[in-house]
Amino acid sequence: TSIYVDMNQTVQVVRDGDGGHDTLKDINEIYGSDYGDTFKGNGNDTLRGLAGNDTFYSGGGSNLYDGGADNDLFIITSSTQGQDSLIGDTGNDTVDFSKVTDLVSPTKGLEITLNGNEEVISKLNGVDSHKLKGIENVTGTIYNDTIQGDSNNNILSGFGGHNTLIGGAGDDTLVGGTGTDVASYETSTSGIKVDLTQINFQVTDDGLGGRDKLSGIDTIVGSDYADTFKGGTNSDTFIGGLGDNWFIGSAGNDYFEGGTGSDTVDYSAAITNLVVDINDGSKYINSYYGTDTFKNIDGIVGGSGDDTLIGNSGRNTLIGGSGNDTLLGYGGDDYIDGGSGSDFVSFAYTAKNIKLDLAITDVQNTNDGNLTIKSIENIAGGAGNDTIYGNDSNNTLRGGYGNDTLVGRGGNNYLIGGLNGYQIVLGAIVLGTTYSFALEGKTVSYVAQNGDTKASVLKALENSFNANNITNSYIVNDGEKLYMSDGSEKIYIL
């Protein structure tokens, strides 16, 4: 059976596994049994566990503990007991620092980087502590620890404090403790994939060829490559690195922070109407998705609802999805794709003189940045003097404030001016096209007939306004331009 060795006592005692108690004198090296032995060192002792799952407790002096075969546990009980050498040998071996509570004014707790069968030195509060070799697993202290694994399948546990755990290669298990704990992948050589909804491995690709299990982790720091992060039901923090990162929204109150690349938040699974604003510090609040907070985010992917997506002054990518979406780039050189549905691009935030042509799908200078638009049917201008052109679809063009020019082109278009007057350019007269205009709250319509010209359409509209008893308006038709005003609103139809 197993033996028990305590070298800390004045009379060193061994329970020999056969029911006897042996007293040792001037003995410095002990070999254990093939079973689960327990050793407590003191002085410059050499204690070897051989086979079995052995347990070693650190003591005074500089001892050598050799676990031998099987899965051994080395427990460090103090920071002042000397520099022991801990050899895991074969098996899956663990060093436990959780009983170290005597650091004086610590600014750091445990610092250690495992390296397989190569000897490494741990530090406690910046001071060399123990020598480790052949150790796979580490449990930290009550202080703020930094624990890094190697190419083996490591189990790294934070215990107390605010800890940083770095798994390295292999299929690792990273366990947070009572503080705020970080799983860091800054040493990965390719992008990582994180999905906290998974049961077995929450990091399905650690960027080093392995997969990791996460428990009690509050923050995940990505690599310098293109990472993918998906949250779970808890409140998680995801921090991207230098690559182009993808953050997938889910339940829980999450914090998404991009890096220096092009970083995107993805709500494509959402079926409710979203309002997402990626200006730094902005919060997106939704009954299902919770409250998400953004920093250094460049792009948004909406869901199947009628979403409002709000960019920032940087280079944004806004993708609406399948609903009827409203997209606001907020300046910068943006790419905006409305997706399916009837989508608006809005410039309501600016007083610049916007010039935009929906028929142009390549980049165009809008006076508010170089904009590329896809699958956009509708435009809302701002407070400037805007010039807005439609395309062959059914467009809604809103002028906003300012003296605006709205050009519908083909399709059945809805052109809405602003308070300071606007021009509506008819373009070519198309047989069967319906022309509708509103003044004094009354709407008139005319369907183009065979042989109509611009002048005949203008005359028909003039007659329709007069026939609808629009008596408080001033209407002038010179054959080239129909001018109407009710005192507050002015319309020019060219």
Predicted segments, located by residue:
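Glycine-centered beta-turn/loop sites at beta-strand termini
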Residues: 1, 7, 17, 32, ...
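GD-rich hexapeptide-repeat beta-solenoids
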Residues: 1-19, 36, 73, 78-128, ...
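Residues in short coils/turns that link rungs of repeat/solenoid architectures in beta-rich domains
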Residues: 31-34, 83, 102, 139-142, ...
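Extended, beta-strand-rich, solvent-exposed assembly scaffolds of outer structural proteins
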Residues: 423-494
